[in-house]
Amino acid sequence: MRPRLLLLTPPFVQTNTPYPATMHLTGFLRSRGFDVFQRDLSIKVVRDILIDYGGDEAEEILELLSSPKVPDDDKVEASRLIDELALEICDQVDASFGFSRYAERISAQAADFGAIEKLIRLRGVMDRPLARHLKEAIAETRPTVIGVTCPFPGTLVGAFKIAKYVRRHHPDIRLVLGGGFVSTELREMTDKRPYTYFDDFLFDEGYAPMLKLLGEDATVKDMPRFVAPCYDGIDWDEYFDVVETENPMHRLWSVGRWRKLQMARGCYWHKCAFCDVILPYINCFEQPKAAEIVDAMEDGCGYHFVDEAMPPALIRQVSEEILRRGLQVEWWGNVRFDLSFTPELCQLMSKAGCIAVTGGLECADDRLLKLMTKGITLSSARKALRAFHRAGIMVHAYLMYGFPTETEVEAYGALEFVRGLFKADLVQSAFWHRFALTVHSPIARDPGRFGIEIADAADRRVTQRAKRTLFCRNEIPFIEPGAPDWDAIGEVLNLALYNFLEGRGLDKTPADWQRLVRRRKRATGK
């Protein structure tokens, strides 16, 4: 008898559209002849929580936020009310509850499973609705295997609460945990306690590992280059927008029922020193035929490509195929700001329905871009951004500060460069990320080259003891002698960027923002 699978998304992820992992794995396994079902418990549980504590008013607000007929601008006040309700639940009922995450901070730093297990055992706002929907899903699908995706720290507790319920009520069902968080954080796990909840932990893309678990011979090389998602079991009417800004680029992550696709597997560059390029799901680059991708775009109108970076040559082919078929679609996704994005290619993308791109400018400094092997320069990036602008394609830039050897002067030089991009309308949205050293990055393999020392290597006794009960390990502490005060610099960068997003302060210098931060600190006594 072949196994029957139920694939689950645990609480909590974004509310406007389903997280794609189960849809792609469902489509793949069904193509191999398996009985597979899926449920998004995240959206079901968060709706129940909000209605349980907000009553009829919350239900009416969610109905308004779910409606495609209500303009985004009219959803701003409703979004504010639902945000306030979520904060009230967090303050008065369950301090771990977040609108699209649960106990995220603890989960992100959980080297020891003990802190997580306390939250798993502690009853919180999700427990009752989660049990109700699990009971219903298992009764409907009668699975022999349940697979749970854990893409982010904010889904970790929810995933293990699912396992706790299934262990108690259906001990014969095999439990499997996979997803992005598992692939990056749990590769070095030595603690045995998580195995009392899950039977198996799968790393990287789930296609080949899941087939092996189900008893079939499979290697990564045997897997298809493109997998069409299956939407059976997804109720699109349950999802709702959260409109927190007037910035149209910034809204894309929280507004709209985007169907998520992957144009290519892995990253075609996979050289950035800060990235987890050692991991197979990033460095195994494969790209399908454009027709396969566009086939999956025939049944909808809005798509978000969740690639590490969409390959320009494939983007061209996909755009041409969309136009050849006469499809009326909108799409956006992640790119690298390199010279492949010519004005001609960007115009073609726009005609084919591309409305926005996101990409990394990182530290926005040529010395640092070279040091991190980013493969772009400020000049080449500006040319690409200008081409997107002229084609009417919006841009979000990922920014970084605190990179090893970065100076205060370079950080404020980057701020000035970014200010110029906003003033010229070459970017419409951005976000500063503070550099984090991850164990799977080239920097972690050769820290001396970047002027840093890995901090936990200093106390080998503690490190060896911790290794025996290690749960999560991805971000690792480091020491950089003489580094600037990145906490203080980060305040300045983030204040300036917040204003840029709203179209304010575009004539202010870095020194102006520094003075403003100092005045605020004096006024608040901090």
Stretches found by the model and what they are:
Residues 2-10, 24, 30-31, 45-65, ...:
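Radical SAM enzyme core and accessory elements
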Residues 4, 12-15, 21-46, 104-231:
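Glycine-rich beta-alpha loop elements in corrinoid/cobalamin-binding modules
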Residues 5, 36, 175, 303, ...:
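Hydrophobic anchor at the start of a short beta-strand
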Residues 6-13, 20-21, 144, 198, ...:
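A structural motif corresponding to the C-terminal lobe/cap of the Radical SAM core domain
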Residues 13-16, 45-46, 153-157, 183-185, ...:
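Flexible loop/turn segments at secondary-structure boundaries
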Residues 40-42, 279, 399:
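Residue-level recognition of beta-strand->loop/alpha-helix junctions
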Residues 44-46, 50-51, 58-143, 189, ...:
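Conserved Radical SAM active-site core
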Residues 232-394:
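Radical SAM [4Fe-4S] cluster-binding motif and immediate context
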